[in-house]
Each structure stands twice: as structure tokens, then as C-alpha cells.
Regions:
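Transmembrane helical elements of multi-pass membrane transporters/channels
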Residues: 16-35, 137, 171, 200-204, ...
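Small-residue-rich hydrophobic transmembrane alpha-helices
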Residues: 48-108, 145-164, 271-335, 368-382, ...
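Short runs within selected transmembrane alpha-helices of multi-pass transporters and secretion channels
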Residues: 69, 137-156, 164-172, 193-208, ...
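Residue-level signal for short hydrophobic patches within transmembrane helices
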Residues: 7, 11-30, 34, 57-64, ...
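Short alpha-helical transmembrane segments in multi-pass integral membrane proteins
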Residues: 1-18, 76-141, 185-241, 297-364, ...
Length: 453
């Protein structure tokens, strides 16, 4: 059922809308972590390093599609808040054509550049064989990623966060079951883990597409053969491409750091692969809360409800900070037991490095929690370019400091670069908000047109 976030109690509306998104991403992390956990436990540290590096690469590639879908979703939310049915349908058609074209191009490039990845990511020879086998299969799932994220973004934009959760749950359970069967039962190795992921992706992508087309009459506009107005393409591009740039820059920075991590050898690669999964579980709820917050802001922005936006912002900051403080304490205390979920107790070097990473990152989750809210805010009020600026500051700082500090203090310097980047981006985003807040929260069609240009 679609939910109108422009009415009802502010925090209750936001939290109830966010809950299925958080549960869905928990399942997504289970989905992503299944390969890592099963491979690490049953195939060893070299295979774990291969899958971990592959995950960073796939996150970068799919972030392009995710950014396009998120940007389109922000515009869908604004049109839904305006009750502009015609503009919403036209935006749906324009965005689908644009993102489908990018998906097909990206898929072709991914396969064409397969053998260039080894040198770009500085993958050790003993890891590359498993990594190549894994990514050659998971690249086939890029189209399924487009299907799921496009239709999930539309459903969330109009207030339906339950249907995406259902299909994610189905695919997560299927992925874990197939992982166990392919890797342990059939001894397919890393190729089995990759195959399990791709099958699960297509089940969720095709399933949510069929359901959305049945439930949402606006999506039937996709069947129309009437010309797509150039103004709608520009409007969608203005939102989607900037959000795509934000997501891509974010994950390109992570990919560059992955290359630096790889230069320290298989043990550090394996520690990073496991710790990043734990990290993602820890701050994932505030990431999804930030996305729910963005939909809330966008609907109310389109409806012109500035006071409701202000109340939502204050409440969202409080919820995010309280959650991050609690999770930081838990990760700090239980860092070693968490690492033992992914690696055997005898792998002392891997465990020690993973614990060091979690103690540094985990102490500063408030920084990333606030940053997710800032990303969501600027995306929702027709300022996606500001989200790009914050991402460049955060990731630019991270990459530069990672290379500088690691040359002086070793791999620990890479870990310290992350929270420093969060802090600088937070300060920039907050200062910009307080300088421009009156203009930011005032909706007008001219705001959307400025985004196009």
C-alpha cells in the first residue's frame, strides 16, 4: 500500500516507512555476506580475498545504476507530493529509457574490461584466478540489479517500502540456500557462490517488476509508444546523473582504497573483506533511515510543507545519533567475536587487523549517520549537486589520506582516513544548510529547472 508522508505524526510516519527499508537492507547484507562467510569458512583466505575484492568492484558498478534509480526516485517523490499524475507518468517513462540504456552499456563494458581489472586493483597473482572466475559470472547479474532497484525506487517514492522488502527477503533466503548447496554440497567453489548470487538477483528483479506493474497504474505508462518529451529527459538527467555521480564517486573512492589494501597482501585483504561486511551491517540502518528521510522530505517539499520538513529533520538527527552511539559501543566491544564469524580462530593476523579496523571505524559511526541524512536532504530539495560535493570531500579526503598515511604508519593509516573524511563532509554540509536553509526548503518549479541545467 502506498503511504502519503505529507500527513500524520512526523516521526511515526518516517519511522514506520523506514522500518521495512531497514529490514530489507539487513536482508541485503545477509545476501551479500553469505558469499563472504561461506567462502571464508569453507574455501580459505585466498578465496575470501577474491570475493572481498570482487564485492568492492561490483559495488562500484551497481552504484551507477543505484544512483540513477535514487535520483529518479527523488523526483518521483516530489511529483507524488504535488499530486501531479501526468508529470509522474512522464518521469517514469523517461527515467526507464535512460537507465535501461546505461545498464546495457555498463554490462557490455564490464565484460569487455574484464582482464584490465587485475592491474587496476593490484590483485595478487594467487588471488586473481578465483576473483576472475567470480566476477565473470556476477557481471551477468547487472541487468537484474537494474530491474530490482528501478522498481523498488518507484515503489518507495510513492510510500510503499513493504513490497521491495518481500522480494529482497525471498532472494536473500534463496541466495543463502544456493550458496550452501553450490559451494559445500556440489563443490563448485567461488563460481558456485557467484552463480547463487546471480540466480537470486534475477528472482528478485523479475518478481518486483511483475508485482509493481500490476499494483501501480502509473507504471503502465511504460507500455506507451508516444514520444518522450526532451524536457522530461533533461529533468530526469538533472536528478539522476548527479545522484549517479555521487554514488559512483563514493564507490570509486572505495575501489581505489581497495587497490591500496590489496597491495598489503592476502591477509590484509581478507581482514578488510570481513571487517567491511561487519561495518556495513553496523551502519546500514542509518543509511536506510537516511533514504527514508529523503523520501519524507521530497514528498513534503513537493507539497510545500516547510514546517513539517523542519520537524522531520530535527527528529531524524536525534534518532540517527542515538542509534550510532549504541552501535559504536557494541562494535567496539564485540569486534573480535564478530571477526570470528568470518574466519577461523587460527587466522590471528587476519583477526587482529580486522579488530583494529573495527575499533577505529566503529568509534565514529555518528559521522556517517549524519552524512547519510545530509545526502538525503540535499537530494530531496533539488540540490543533488550538493550531495556530490559532500561525497567528493568525504571520499577525496579518504583516498588522499589513505595513500599519505599508509606510507607513514602502514595499513592503519587507511583505516584512519575514513572517519576524517566523514567529519569534514559533515561540517561542510551543516554549514551550507544553516547559510541557505530558508531558500533550500522553499519549493518551486524553478528549483527543478535549475537542477536540469
Amino acid at each position: 500500500m502506498n503511504k502519503d508522508l505529507t500527513r500524520g505524526p512526523v516521526m511515526r510516519s518516517m519511522l514506520w516507512f523506514a522500518l521495512p527499508m531497514i529490514l530489507g537492507n539487513l536482508l541485503q547484507q545477509c545476501y551479500n555476506s553469505a558469499d563472504t562467510l561461506i567462502v571464508g569458512r569453507f574455501l580459505g583466505k585466498t578465496a575470501l580475498a577474491a570475493v572481498g575484492s570482487s564485492f568492492s568492484l561490483m559495488t562500484f558498478l551497481t552504484s551507477i545504476l543505484l544512483g540513477l534509480c535514487m535520483g529518479s526516485g527523488a523526483l518521483f517523490s516530489i511529483r507524488f507530493g504535488q499530486r501531479d499524475e501526468t508529470a509522474l507518468k512522464e518521469s517514469v517513462r523517461a527515467s526507464f529509457v535512460l537507465i535501461l540504456g546505461v545498464t546495457l552499456l555498463l554490462n557490455g563494458l564490464a565484460f569487455a574490461c574484464l582482464d584490465l581489472i587485475k592491474s587496476f586493483l593490484q590483485v595478487p597473482d594467487d588471488v586473481w584466478g578465483d576473483m576472475r572466475a567470480y566476477i565473470a559470472i556476477v557481471f551477468a547479474g547487472i541487468f537484474a540489479t537494474f530491474l530490482y532497484n528501478y522498481f523498488a525506487s518507484y515503489l518507495r517514492a510513492v510510500g510503499n517500502s513493504v513490497v521491495p522488502l518481500v522480494f529482497l527477503a525471498v532472494s536473500a533466503v534463496l541466495n543463502i540456500a544456493l550458496d550452501l548447496w553450490f559451494v559445500i554440497g556440489l563443490n563448485f567453489g567461488v563460481a558456485g557462490a557467484a552463480g547463487a548470487t546471480v540466480i537470486a538477483q534475477y528472482v528478485s528483479g523479475i518478481g518486483i517488476m511483475i508485482c509493481a506493474l500490476i499494483k501501480c497504474p502509473q507504471l503502465r505508462a511504460l507500455r506507451s509508444r508516444s514520444p518522450i518529451h526532451a524536457s522530461r529527459i533533461r529533468e530526469i538527467a538533472g536528478y539522476s546523473i548527479l545522484t549517479c555521480v555521487q554514488q559512483s564517486v563514493m564507490n570509486l573512492g572505495i575501489l581505489m582504497v581497495q587497490g591500496l589494501v590489496n597491495s598489503f597482501g592476502a591477509a590484509v585483504m581478507a581482514a578488510f573483506a570481513a571487517a567491511v561486511k561487519i561495518d556495513a551491517f553496523a551502519y546500514m540502518p542509518v543509511q536506510d533511515f537516511g533514504n527514508a528521510f529523503s523520501t519524507f522530505i521530497a514528498q513534503n517539499y513537493g507539497a510545500g510543507k516547510q514546517e513539517r520538513i523542519r520537524k522531520g529533520l530535527k527528529g531524524a538527527v536525534l534518532v540517527s545519533v542515538v542509534f550510532c552511539v549504541i552501535v559504536s559501543a557494541l562494535v567496539f566491544v564485540f569486534a573480535k567475536p564478530l571477526m570470528l564469524l568470518f574466519v577461523e580462530a587460527g587466522e590471528t593476523e587476519i583477526i587482529a587487523e580486522g579488530v583494529r579496523y573495527l575499533h577505529i571505524e566503529g568509534a565514529f559511526y555518528c559521522g556517517i549517520g549524519c552524512l547519510f541524512l545530509l545526502y538525503g536532504l540535499y537530494r530531496a530539495v533539488a540540490k543533488p549537486g550538493m550531495s556530490v560535493v559532500l561525497t567528493v570531500i568525504s571520499l577525496g579526503t579518504r583516498v588522499v589520506l589513505a595513500y599519505l598515511l599508509s606510507a607513514v604508519i602502514g595499513v592503519t593509516g587507511i583505516w584512519w582516513s575514513v572517519p576524517i573524511g566523514w567529519f569534514l563532509a559533515d561540517v561542510t554540509g551543516v554549514v551550507y544548510y544553516f547559510i541557505h536553509k530558508e531558500k533550500l526548503l522553499h519549493f518551486g518549479e524553478s528549483n527543478l529547472k535549475r537542477t536540469e541545467s
